[in-house]
Amino acid sequence: MTKAVNKSNRTNNTNRKTEFWQKLPIHIAILTIAFIWTLPSLGLFISSLRPRGDMLSTGWWTVFWHPLEITQFYLGNYGDVLRSSGMGEAFLNSLTIAVPATVIPIAIATFAAYAFAWMTFPGRQLLFILVVCLLVVPLQTTLIPVLRVYAQLGLAGTFLGVWLAHTAYGLPLGIYLLRNYIGALPKDLIEAAAVDGASHLKIFTKLIVPLSMPAIASFAVFQFLWVWNDLLVALVYLGGTADVAPVTIQLSNLVGSRGQDWYLLTAGAFISMIVPLMVFFGLQRYFVRGILAGSVKS
């Protein structure tokens, strides 16, 4: 009996060692990709903590030659960014833009996704194909035509105009992602609710929305990060004036007309990350589930 147990233990140890060596190349590849992906952010963060003269004379990696030398680190860049004129107002403008530009497309995309998944109407599949095709249309091709329309309607330079623009640009992805998820919900559950006399509105509010929270949260993260980090759309439709300028425009203005204060961008980039990181970590538990379900299920 003892010999059999010892033999089994040796077999298990051998199997574990074999499995370890088989998976070692995969682990090395994953760690290498993670290192390469993280390296630019690490360099940006270290640069944000260095004086301008050091950034001009030496590379950021030189801090590792004397890692315990505290005097080589400098917080003045963050102070300069926070004390710059209009930064507080820019944060409020970014929130004013990002929150409605996230909530509005979520509401519209969820309704549309339910209609594509569970309602029958003429041309449903063709219309959904057209929505998917919009995913590959570059938004840059729409900037000038839409801006001309905005100028005629008086929407240029207003928050409403940029809300509508971000809603239009985000809807194709939202509808595609949510339709795949909602369409994979149990058919028996939807049919049972319909047999009990529930209307489409009641099914949508009582069943679809609660069950689709992972996908909705995933799209919310994508949309919020896109809107918060956007510079081009805000610059075109808002014009860059101080009273409506978001953080991205304010950071670009910090550099100066000739780029002489470029070093402030390192600190400004990390300051602007605070709100998106809070949103991401707040919805993180839904994020992976929503992405996997929306892309794998059919």
UniProtKB/Swiss-Prot annotation:
Entry keyword set: Cell membrane, Membrane, Sugar transport, Transmembrane, Transmembrane helix, Transport
Disruption phenotype: Inactivation of the gene results in loss of the ability to take up glucosylglycerol and sucrose, as well as to accumulate exogenous trehalose. Insertion causes leakage of glucosylglycerol from the cells into the medium.
Main subcellular location of this protein, as a coarse class: membrane
Gene Ontology cellular-component terms listed: plasma membrane
Gene3D superfamilies according to UniProt: MetI-like (1.10.3720.10)
UniProt cross-references to Pfam families, sorted A to Z: BPD_transp_1 (PF00528)
Lineage: superkingdom: Bacteria
InterPro entries according to UniProt: MetI-like (IPR000515), MetI-like_sf (IPR035906)
Its job: Part of the ABC transporter complex GgtABCD involved in the uptake of the osmoprotective compounds glucosylglycerol (GG), sucrose and trehalose. Responsible for the translocation of the substrate across the membrane.
Similarity comment: Belongs to the binding-protein-dependent transport system permease family.
Annotated protein name in UniProt: Osmoprotective compounds uptake permease protein GgtD
